[in-house]
A protein has these predicted regions:
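Non-catalytic DNA-recognition/assembly elements of restriction-modification systems
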Residues: 1-11, 144, 148, 152, ...
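Sequence-specific dsDNA recognition surfaces
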Residues: 2-17, 30-64
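A short glycine-rich beta-alpha junction/loop motif
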Residues: 15, 88-97, 106-109, 124, ...
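A short beta-sheet element
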Residues: 28, 54-116, 138-139
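Interdomain boundary/hinge elements
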Residues: 94, 172-173
Length: 199
């Protein structure tokens, strides 16, 4: 990966410097979950003066964030999320890594999908360090990942195809949820009819 991205580690913002609201939101491990950047779950902010003095940790559109710490042996981290175009100042906290692509031959969405692949996760978690309960992934392990990069046009095609299949899976899951709801309502109606002697 180090041929196409650079790594930025986070800053150790102190909880006693957090304020209720400001223009500077700190992105912590809990904000990167299940491959989404979630800004409204227990948001924390720092004062303008701290934000401005730690601007080197300011995130940019299309940065790829990943969680570097979790439960050892459980593979409950290395979640990734792409930073969207937003008007907030987002600051990178410790134990959240940032990959910033410097190659014009990379589709960021393709790279995000590759980082979710089983072979990448197997390679990453084979380098896990830490103690009995806490697992860690280092920046070097991440940058040393070997991934196949097809031509840019093929990357675009792969992204479109995968997004098409993911949309179909989402429809199936929604249909399954709707069906379960219908089954539950039907069972309830049958019980109601039986109780009232109408069966």
């Amino acid at each position: 990966l180090d041929d196409i991205v650079s790594f930025q580690g986070g800053y150790a913002y102190k909880s006693n410097t957090y304020v209720n609201q400001s223009d500077w939101q700190v992105i912590r491990i809990g904000n990167v979950k299940n491959d989404n950047l979630i800004l409204d779950i227990q948001p924390v902010f720092v004062e303008d003066v701290i934000g401005k003095t730690t601007e080197k940790y300011l995130l940019k559109k299309d940065d790829i964030l990943f969680t570097m710490t979790g439960t050892k042996g459980k593979r409950d981290y290395f979640y990734t999320a792409k930073v969207p175009s937003i008007k907030k100042n987002l600051l990178l906290n410790q134990r959240v890594g940032c990959l910033r692509c410097f190659s014009s031959e990379i589709n960021i969405d393709f790279l995000c999908l590759v980082l979710k692949g089983e072979y990448v996760l197997d390679a990453i978690f084979s380098t896990e360090t830490g103690n009995v309960s806490q697992g860690n992934i280092g920046s070097e392990s991440t940058l040393n990942l070997n991934i196949a990069i097809p031509p840019l046009t093929e990357q675009h095609r792969i992204v479109v195809e995968i997004e098409k299949w993911f949309a179909l899976i989402d429809q199936i899951e929604q249909g399954k949820s709707d069906l379960q709801s219908t089954i539950k309502q039907t069972k309830s109606k049958i019980l109601d009819l039986a109780i009232h002697g109408k069966l």
